[in-house]
Amino acid sequence: MNLMRRGDFLVIAHRGYSDGYLENSREAFEAAIATGADLIETDVRLSSDGTLYCNHDPDLERVRGTDRSIAELPDESLDELNVLRLSDVLEIARDRVGVLLDLKLAYRDYPVLVHDAVSAQGMQSSVVFGVRNVAQAQALHQRAPDAVILGFLNDRSDFPAFFVAGGGIARLWEDETDATSVAAARAGNHPVWITTGQRKDGTAGEIDEARLRRLIALEIDGVLVNAPHRALALRNETANLA
């Protein structure tokens, strides 16, 4: 799969098929793959033992019923709580689907650590590394010039510097997406992916048909959605009408 391609409206399953299954679970990822998603998306954090685990929030209260944080728990406890390791997610995806990693820690060399773990499993060509700032993009590009890097940047004005640093894909939120913001984020001919839903109200990944059609009309290159089957059906319908 060409993870940098433009114009195909890639469907990325946000935390897996999280509309119908527990987010970041094996079941959610398997369902997303079975539905035909182009990529699955997951969040990457470090345990107290230094192992990479997949969970969106810093703690496990919302999905596992404990307010303990990933960072303070050892591997044994996280495994008992059925939190997937990054290595587990990569094996689920191997030879089946691309993977977008949302790297939740903001220190400069964190993407390098994650890239080394991905490379150890021989999966680097199937992974998009989602970084939080320009410094992370620069560090990863220096370590792995061929890595595909997406920017989960808070400030859209940082995208030009992000691309100079080696970034390849711009991510915008749906509620800040219009023709002007897309053109600015593209900075020439870079792909733009959209996290659907709203930035601050807990609806990330949620979207209806009318809003999906608006994004298609804006020639967005990828969408992060909780229910990938809806976006896939609309993409197929649009392609058949072309």
Which ranges hold each PLM region?
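Phosphate-group recognition and catalysis centered on beta-loop-alpha active-site segments
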Residues: 1-242
